[in-house]
């Protein structure tokens, strides 16, 4: 368990106090993949770097388990950092070392015997699919391969927590998907707690269990990804979701003016996503429908669907009751 208790961070610049992170309270459960999303300057990198005290907090407390990280001395901090791995946007690999040498580096710093290092490096390169690249140098690798080396290096000391600082931002979409699949596999197989920061809601949707949304250094929304993604409350969250779904809300509302009837958003979650609920209820209630927008996808392993439909004729109240009885969430957009 990682607990932020009124943790905050400020800087002094030319005699002025700049607040990077306002006091916040947050809990991240053991074994979770927890996402932190925000635009540039929102405070997300500051937040993740407070966990291993690469940034020193200005106040508040940070607990990992029962240990108060904010109270650790230098020796305690070194021990903590061996339990926390970190991967970076631009990989931070040592260009003069081979792939195997980069993965071995934290073990060498820890004084691990050579035989153990060699065995651990071989194990980790197999895990990230780079066995055949052990003797290559970073300059000979693709971006995705470099990030896999970074992941292997971060796992070298068998950490309990893995911090991912914009780990996919420098990668193309296909490589991003493969790296996210690898992180999800590591989470499942090793039970690591993963804290991932990004400015892309699609990354959150694919891999995270819960998410926190930061805006101008403030925590504005948090919750399970299914809830936050499908029913965003804060304006910043709604913008992120619209960008992920490639929906122009203003354009969509202009389209509403061209159609009559009651406009609703229907949200299907789980196996019900694939059931012919809309057609059945239309037949039962005499309601006609016009689909204005639709999407079927997955949030991590959970299928979901969203339709925006215009309903005309028939019994609207009976239709709404039928949707609710079928487990479909109904949001009135225009009555």
UniProtKB/Swiss-Prot annotation:
UniProt-listed Gene3D superfamilies: 3.30.70.260, P-loop containing nucleotide triphosphate hydrolases (3.40.50.300)
PANTHER family, alphabetized: AMINO ACID IMPORT ATP-BINDING PROTEIN, METHIONINE IMPORT ATP-BINDING PROTEIN METN
Entry similarity comment: Belongs to the ABC transporter superfamily. Methionine importer (TC 3.A.1.24) family.
Residues spanning the membrane: none
ABC transporter domain: residues covered: 2-241
EC code: 7.4.2.11
Protein name in the entry: Methionine import ATP-binding protein MetN
